[in-house]
């Protein structure tokens, strides 16, 4: 089945200037399935970084998320199911989250290993961990008990219609690191691979695709607003890393945030991240499904009996896009939205699926709004609200009527799509993109030609050694001499 044709007027869709990026300056651009994955250090593309400075990160700000984030471990049956999927060579397109459902156990832990009050029914008291979402998306996360102090080799494997990575952790020089280096694992899971094409993993980096970052959100009722945190306990460049994550995911909501985030404030917009939720190859074209991780809204209900009280509810990326003007705004980028990545991907379509408000909101009248903050225009961020929950499940390549809400958001609803329930407002955009082999080659060459270390629009690639040429995706024309030889050998000359 060929991909659908582009909607009218979607051929000229410029990408915005990104403010953060990855510089891949070592390793090979393409990796074989049986090779270990390199760990690239993510850098702020402004070289020196203009995110939070050292003084902007207090002791509690740097350590609290690590100490309180719930831990997630996989069950034996889940790992077995993943193994079966790998062995079967499943290749049926982007599998919906409903088809990839797994069972996970959630525990609370502080930095000393103390087990807190997290429960197995996905109700969190303070922080939210994305490990569950990674399980749902087909990214294999080894059991936590095998991680501390036991670095392993990351192996890429084919699983569930996409490429999963059983990622390695890094040996820690810190005696206090009792949790795995999650952000490093997710970094090379998301930015060192996109999909399986012609027997290889296609490796691409983009300053607009920092997908699958580990994040936690502060849900304390006293905070009054959604607040971004990120686990940044790394063995290299911690301050640069903190600046990068803060710039990409949105600044921490405190009195000094605006002045310390000059990169983002210059655009009057906090930059959303793309989350790659599904990957596939259709007729030698790389296809990805992604949604933009903007803010996590949480229920502001005052009803103490509401099942959703104090839980994170939704990811919101845009404020007030309606069905009539949404496409136009996305294409023209007048609302500060991210378009196709560096003009390398062609936007095919956007989708927005939300759960009905009735029966799924807090408050006795089911009419209390969910408040969100990022990313919206600076002058309206305090008043931005969403009135419905957003589904973050990818469709497969050809559409899927099974819709699942991220378990990691504390919502465990599975339902069939009912178009009558879809409102006109689209708070969440699901973006489908497609790129062919020649575009991949052009993208690599274009990135390699970039010499400006402060480039905000391109990614620097290290040219792979000549010995790795079989791994490179190129189009090689058949020379006249070769044709002549083939004709001669076949007796047709």
Swiss-Prot record:
InterPro entries per record: MgpC
Coiled coil ranges: none
Family: Belongs to the MgpC family.
Lineage: Bacteria, Bacillati, Mycoplasmatota, Mycoplasmoidales, Mycoplasmoidaceae
Protein name: Putative MgpC-like protein MPN_414
Stretches with biased composition (Polar residues): 1-14, 72-92, 445-472
Superkingdom, taxonomy of origin: Bacteria
Alphabetical list of Pfam families matching this protein: MgpC
Ranges of Basic and acidic residues composition bias in the record: 25-34, 44-56, 482-493
Renumbered residue ranges of the record's region Disordered: 1-92, 441-493
Residues annotated as transmembrane: none
Organism, as annotated: Mycoplasma pneumoniae (strain ATCC 29342 / M129 / Subtype 1)
């Amino acid at each position: 089945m060929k991909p659908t044709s582009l909607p009218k007027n979607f051929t000229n869709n410029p990408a915005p200037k990104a403010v953060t990026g990855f510089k891949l300056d070592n390793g090979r651009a393409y990796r074989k399935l049986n090779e270990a994955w390199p760990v690239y250090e993510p850098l702020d593309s402004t070289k020196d970084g203009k995110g939070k400075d050292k003084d902007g990160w207090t002791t509690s700000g740097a350590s609290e998320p690590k100490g309180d984030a719930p831990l997630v471990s996989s069950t034996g049956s889940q790992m077995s199911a993943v193994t079966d999927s790998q062995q079967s060579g499943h290749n049926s397109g982007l599998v919906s989250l409903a088809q990839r459902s797994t069972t996970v156990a959630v525990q609370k832990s502080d930095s000393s290993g103390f087990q807190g009050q997290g429960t197995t029914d996905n109700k969190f008291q303070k922080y939210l961990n994305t490990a569950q979402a990674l399980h749902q998306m087909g990214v294999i996360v080894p059991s936590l008990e095998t991680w501390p102090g036991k670095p392993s080799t990351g192996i890429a494997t084919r699983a569930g219609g996409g490429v999963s990575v059983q990622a390695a952790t890094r040996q820690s020089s810190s005696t206090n690191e009792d949790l795995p280096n999650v952000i490093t694992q997710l970094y090379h899971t998301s930015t060192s691979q996109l999909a399986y094409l012609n027997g290889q993993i296609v490796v691409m980096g983009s300053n607009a695709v920092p997908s699958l970052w580990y994040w936690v959100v502060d849900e304390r009722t006293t905070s009054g607003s959604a607040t971004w945190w990120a686990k940044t306990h790394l063995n290299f460049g911690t301050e640069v890393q903190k600046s990068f994550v803060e710039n990409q995911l949105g600044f921490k909501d405190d009195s000094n945030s605006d002045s310390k985030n000059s990169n983002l404030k210059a655009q009057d917009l906090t930059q959303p991240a793309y989350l790659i939720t599904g990957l596939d190859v259709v007729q030698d074209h790389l296809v990805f499904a992604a949604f933009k991780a903007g803010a996590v809204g949480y229920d502001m209900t005052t009803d103490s009996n509401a099942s959703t009280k104090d839980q994170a509810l939704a990811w919101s990326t845009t404020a007030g896009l309606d069905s009539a003007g949404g496409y136009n705004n996305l294409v023209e980028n007048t609302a500060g939205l991210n378009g196709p990545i560096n003009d390398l991907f062609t936007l095919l379509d956007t989708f927005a699926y939300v759960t009905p408000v009735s029966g799924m909101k807090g408050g006795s009248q089911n009419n209390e709004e969910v408040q969100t903050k990022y990313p919206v225009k600076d002058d309206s961020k305090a008043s931005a609200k969403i009135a419905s929950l957003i589904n973050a499940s990818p469709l497969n390549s050809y559409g899927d009527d099974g819709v699942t809400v991220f378990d990691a958001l504390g919502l465990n609803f599975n339902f069939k799509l009912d178009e009558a329930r879809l409102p006109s407002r689209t708070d969440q955009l699901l973006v489908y993109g497609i790129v062919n082999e020649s575009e991949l080659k052009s993208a690599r060459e274009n990135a390699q030609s970039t010499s400006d270390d402060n480039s905000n629009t391109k990614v620097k690639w290290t040219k792979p050694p000549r010995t790795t040429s079989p791994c490179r995706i190129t189009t090689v024309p058949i020379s006249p001499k070769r044709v002549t030889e083939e004709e001669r050998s076949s007796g047709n000359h």
